[in-house]
A protein has these predicted regions:
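Flexible, compositionally biased loop and terminal segments
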Residues: 1-200
Length: 200
């Protein structure tokens, strides 16, 4: 199941920054895909520290320690998930500034892609270098043995899609999954059904 996280709601802001993602975690045996996540809280909020005020956190200031504390919280949360059997795959699709510009122009110049355009994207583009610095520090601080980051070059979509598909297939393969076991009674029913169908 895929979940896209948008701007936090007032209910989200009444909880810790991890809460809304915790609610969307897949149950055991399922795959969950997060488009954005609690990592926004060490990216967008770091680039725009005024957003911390809306979170009503006592005694917090947009200084380096706030972000390091959040990195620690994220690492502890992901370690908890990994210890409980969740395979975590974190993918950063790295798009260059030039390619980002080309994609925005494509959305602007093609009416069939206007639905993808958001003025906020152009506004945020002026912070490209700030985001790059925040991404680099985030990846360095939160790439762990139990929840590593994979930085995938994404200027060419076919390259990124192939890399991501290969990565996910490899991760699933490493889980050593098997078909569900069937009882002796089910085996007998299967054999009986096969004989019946073959006799038709």
């Amino acid at each position: 199941e895929g979940t896209s996280f948008k701007e936090p709601s007032s209910e989200d802001l009444d909880h810790t920054f991890l809460w809304r993602c915790m609610k969307k975690l897949p149950e055991r045996g399922r795959i969950g895909i997060f488009n954005r996540s609690y990592y926004e809280e060490v990216l967008i909020v770091r680039v725009h520290p005024n957003l911390l005020e809306a979170q009503r956190i006592p005694n917090v200031h947009p200084e380096d320690q706030t972000w390091h504390d959040r990195f620690d919280d994220i690492n502890a949360f992901e370690k908890h998930l990994a210890r409980n059997g969740t395979a975590i795959v974190k993918i950063f699709l790295h798009v260059s500034k030039e390619e980002q510009k080309n994609r925005f122009l494509d959305r602007i110049n093609r009416p069939d892609k206007h639905w993808k355009f958001a003025g906020a994207d152009i506004k945020e583009r002026q912070y490209f270098d700030d985001y790059t610095q925040a991404y680099e520090e985030m990846i360095a601080a939160t790439s762990t043995e139990y929840a590593p980051w994979y930085v995938v070059p994404a200027d060419k979509k076919w390259v990124s899609r192939t890399a991501v598909a290969t990565l996910l297939a490899g991760t699933i393969d490493q889980l050593g999954l098997t078909w569900p076991a069937v009882s002796e009674k089910q085996e007998q029913e299967i054999e009986s059904a096969r004989k019946k169908l073959e006799a038709e």
